[in-house]
UniProtKB/Swiss-Prot annotation:
GO terms for molecular function: 5-amino-6-(5-phosphoribosylamino)uracil reductase activity; diaminohydroxyphosphoribosylaminopyrimidine deaminase activity; metal ion binding; NADP binding. Its cofactor is Zn(2+). Residues 6-128 form the CMP/dCMP-type deaminase domain. It comes from the Bacteria. It comes from Chlamydia muridarum (strain MoPn / Nigg). Substrate binds at residues 173, 189, 209, 212, 299. This is Riboflavin biosynthesis protein RibD. The gene is ribD. The lineage of its organism: Bacteria, Pseudomonadati, Chlamydiota, Chlamydiia, Chlamydiales. CDD domains: Riboflavin_deaminase-reductase. One of its GO terms (biological process) is riboflavin biosynthetic process. Pathway: Cofactor biosynthesis; riboflavin biosynthesis; 5-amino-6-(D-ribitylamino)uracil from GTP: step 2/4; Cofactor biosynthesis; riboflavin biosynthesis; 5-amino-6-(D-ribitylamino)uracil from GTP: step 3/4. InterPro entries: CMP_dCMP_dom, Cytidine_deaminase-like, DHFR-like_dom_sf, Eubact_RibD, RibD_C, RibDG_C, Riboflavin_Biosynth_HTPR.
Length: 371
């Protein structure tokens, strides 16, 4: 049966949507989705549910009840061709005698890149690459970025008043955004493998940094909570050190006392030391990537956000605009960047919509105006 380009895109978008279901549990693997189509109808759906579990293609094959001979397979990422925790997906595709495989994106992993396509073509299967490319790229951007750069995809998150203040003149920020916005942050944290916060924010707000569902229950998988504290100024009774909400890492320097470090290590906190005077943020990100982090959420405050901006380490951002005005005596989102219009940081706004009584703006970083 002839399938139009519009139908092909429809099927791939369905695969992308399926892949998103695995976004929380799949990392450090990519959240891949797959649909199987025969005679113009979807007969199988699948997505990768977590490390060590069957890949999307296998799940889709297990979901169908018809013969796969002559079927078309739509998958958001190039099928693997190597043995890992699971067998190669290309072997299953070849054995099942499918007619065609539509792939949205090639896998940048050197163990797979173009090799999966080559294996399928050698077996006489028609392969088409690029259908739904933009949709799949938008979904899998953290995975693609981490594989290509060795750094996790860094998302800056902040809440601000309509005039751009992240706290009032007393330094208080709870709460600028509304309740629905705060619930939305729970999902954003769950989709990240690490959440980074600065010492001043911990001292002022005493956050748990846990990822909670709208019901108030913790997500089954919690992000690593990372506290950037060069001198060990965060008190030992801060809620962030509580192991009940997941693992914690202290990113610090030689300025932090051995006694403070030992007390935290005794509680199960991992300690990562950087350069003598201040935490090397790029090295920290490299370390988090080595631990399997694909996406990192930087929650601030302004000093930490500004440090990431100065080093051009921010890839995207989410701003929750609360329905308030605070004047100019609070804390701005960013400090001391020394930028003018002709060398300003340029971003592409990708989404803006209401979340309860707050406005959520999503953006991706493009670069500086001066190139």
């Amino acid at each position: 049966m002839e399938v139009s380009s519009e139908q092909q895109l429809f099927f791939m978008r369905e695969a992308v949507a399926l892949g998103e279901r695995g976004r929380i549990f799949a990392p450090p693997n990519p959240w891949v989705g797959c649909v199987i189509v025969k005679n113009g109808c979807i007969i199988g759906r699948g997505w990768h549910k977590g490390i060590g579990s069957p890949h999307a293609e296998v799940c889709a094959f297990q979901d169908q009840t018809s013969s796969l001979v002559g079927a078309d397979v739509y998958v958001t990422l190039e099928p693997c061709c190597h043995f890992g925790r699971t067998p190669p997906c290309v072997d299953l595709l070849i054995k099942s005698k499918v007619s065609s495989v539509y792939i949205a994106l090639l896998d940048p992993d050197p163990r797979v890149c173009k090799r999966g396509v080559a294996r399928l073509k050698e077996a006489g299967i028609s392969v088409y690459v690029g259908i739904g490319h933009e949709e799949a790229k938008a979904s899998l951007q953290p995975y693609l970025h981490q594989r290509e750069t060795g750094l996790p995809w860094v998302v800056m998150k902040t809440a601000a008043s309509l005039d751009g203040q992240t706290s009032d003149r007393r330094g208080i920020s709870q709460w600028i955004s509304g309740e629905q916005a705060r619930l939305d942050v729970g999902r954003l944290r769950a989709e990240s493998q690490a959440v980074i916060v600065g010492s001043r924010t911990v001292c002022l707000d005493n956050p748990r940094l846990s990822a909670r569902m709208p019901s108030g229950d913790l997500y089954e998988r919690q992000p690593l909570r990372v506290v950037v504290d060069s001198r060990g100024s965060v008190p030992l009774d801060a809620r962030v050190w509580n192991p009940d909400s997941g693992n914690v890492l202290l990113a610090t320097t030689e300025q932090c006392s051995k006694e403070h470090i030992q007390k935290l290590e005794d509680r199960g906190v991992e300690v990562w030391k950087s350069s003598p005077q201040q935490v090397d943020l790029k090295r920290l990100l490299q370390y988090l990537a080595e631990k399997g982090c694909l996406q990192v959420l930087v929650e601030g405050g302004a000093r930490l956000h500004s440090a990431f901006w100065r080093e051009h380490l921010v890839n995207a951002g989410v701003i929750y605009w609360g329905p308030k005005f605070l004047g100019d005596q609070g804390s701005p989102m960013l400090r001391d960047l020394q930028l003018c219009l002709d060398n300003a940081e340029h971003v592409k706004i990708t989404k803006t919509f209401l979340v309860g009584d707050s406005v959520k703006t999503c953006f991706e970083c493009v670069g500086r105006e001066d190139g």
